[in-house]
């Protein structure tokens, strides 16, 4: 009798583990469903029947993103149930700033060797993020690639599609001098600046993943794995009743790089640094890394996850509405005339 033939599992790809994984995630995926979803998990493509009668001139808005090296923290702590929320947040927050309602989401999960339990924890987080954002998880790809990743490592990418009526697109073009800038509080680092944060926390300060942070009642893992806040439902609620001229998602590049993305030519943002209290984790990073303020504001969100430009006359009512939506909001500055040769964001 000849030698036993080589199998796919011998090469490092376990089809049975993949099937187990799919069975484990089905209830999570189904919990995100919307009436427009007309397909089930396991098909070749996700089907979504858009009700165009709800819109005068619907425009689809797409976004894609990842979680970056925050995944390294999840692997160090062996906690994988929150990074999926981050994945959804990074995508849906990017499209809601244009006024779009997220409709559906897809994910890409790549790993060297599939652990059904670890993968299911990640997808559970993705499903939770979709529920928070009101969008359906209608598909995804799980890629098991032996030899491509170190043991226990994985990477994530997310993709979302939303819709907005053409005449309700928010692109910052209607921002004018005198508009007030309102900042929405972040939940922490969100999903940006982690390469620098890891260097300071672990290399410079010498903390371990389970150590308690100084002056904190939280561990390093608890703080660094706090999920990115999803602002979708609050922003969409606000847009139904108030005029918002521009919205910036404060991601990589911080306030200094993201606020200018929505400012029309001839406008600049004046932001008052003392208008909100910077969370302690940012103080720890700044002091631990001996960081200049400019570097802080172009690397981290520093406690502000989203910035809205609104007419000055609406500010009080907007703040009341945001408070009712459980958002911590601060008047952080205003839009001013930008003189030639000056920076588009002035921190004072």
From Swiss-Prot:
Source species, domain of life: Bacteria
SUPFAM superfamilies attached to this UniProt entry: PurM C-terminal domain-like, PurM N-terminal domain-like
Gene Ontology MF: a single term: phosphoribosylamine-glycine ligase activity
Pathway membership: Purine metabolism; IMP biosynthesis via de novo pathway; 5-amino-1-(5-phospho-D-ribosyl)imidazole from N(2)-formyl-N(1)-(5-phospho-D-ribosyl)glycinamide: step 2/2
Primary subcellular site in the record, as a coarse category: cytoplasm
E.C. numbers: 6.3.3.1
InterPro entries: PurM-like_C_dom, PurM-like_C_sf, PurM-like_N, PurM-like_N_sf, PurM_cligase
Gene3D superfamilies (UniProt xref): PurM-like C-terminal domain, PurM-like, N-terminal domain
Keywords recorded for this protein, A-Z: ATP-binding, Cytoplasm, Ligase, Nucleotide-binding, Purine biosynthesis
Compartments (UniProt record): Cytoplasm
Pfam families, per database record: AIRS (PF00586), AIRS_C (PF02769)
GO BP term, pick one: 'de novo' IMP biosynthetic process
Annotated Gene Ontology cellular component terms: cytosol
Catalytic activity: 2-formamido-N(1)-(5-O-phospho-beta-D-ribosyl)acetamidine + ATP = 5-amino-1-(5-phospho-beta-D-ribosyl)imidazole + ADP + phosphate + H(+)
Top enzyme category: ligase
The family this protein is said to belong to: Belongs to the AIR synthase family.
Annotated HAMAP family: AIRS
Annotated protein name in UniProt: Phosphoribosylformylglycinamidine cyclo-ligase
Species this chain originates from: Geobacter metallireducens (strain ATCC 53774 / DSM 7210 / GS-15)
Gene giving rise to this polypeptide: purM
């Amino acid at each position: 009798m000849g030698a036993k033939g080589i199998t796919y599992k011998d090469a490092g790809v376990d089809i049975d583990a993949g099937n187990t994984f799919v069975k484990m995630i089905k209830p999570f995926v189904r919990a995100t469903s919307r009436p427009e979803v007309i397909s089930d998990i396991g098909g070749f493509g996700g089907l979504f029947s858009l009700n165009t009668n709800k819109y005068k001139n619907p425009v689809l808005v797409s976004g894609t993103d990842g979680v970056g090296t925050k995944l390294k923290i999840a692997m160090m702590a062996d906690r994988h149930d929150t990074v999926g929320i981050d994945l959804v947040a990074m995508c849906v927050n990017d499209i809601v700033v244009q006024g779009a309602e997220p409709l559906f989401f897809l994910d890409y999960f790549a790993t060297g060797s599939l652990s059904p339990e670890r993968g299911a924890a990640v997808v559970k987080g993705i499903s939770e993020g979709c529920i928070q954002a009101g969008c359906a998880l209608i598909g995804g790809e799980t890629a098991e690639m032996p030899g491509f990743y170190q043991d226990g490592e994985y990477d994530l990418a997310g993709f979302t599609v939303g819709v907005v009526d053409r005449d309700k697109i928010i692109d910052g073009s209607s921002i004018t001098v005198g508009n007030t800038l309102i900042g929405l509080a972040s939940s922490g680092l969100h999903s940006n600046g982690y390469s620098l944060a890891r260097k300071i926390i672990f290399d410079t300060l010498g903390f371990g993943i389970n150590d308690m942070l100084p002056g904190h009642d939280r561990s390093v893992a608890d703080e660094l794995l706090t999920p990115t806040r999803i602002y979708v439902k609050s922003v969409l609620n606000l847009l139904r009743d108030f005029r918002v001229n521009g919205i910036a998602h404060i991601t990589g590049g911080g306030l200094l790089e993201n606020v200018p993305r929505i400012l029309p030519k001839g406008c600049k943002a004046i932001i008052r640094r003392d208008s909100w209290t910077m969370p302690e984790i940012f103080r720890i990073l700044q002091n631990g890394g001996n960081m200049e303020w400019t570097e802080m504001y172009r690397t981290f969100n520093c406690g502000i996850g989203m910035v809205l430009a609104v007419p000055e006359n609406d500010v009080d009512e907007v703040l009341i509405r945001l408070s009712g939506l459980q958002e911590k909001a601060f008047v952080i500055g205003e839009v001013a005339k930008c003189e030639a040769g000056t920076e588009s964001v002035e921190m004072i």
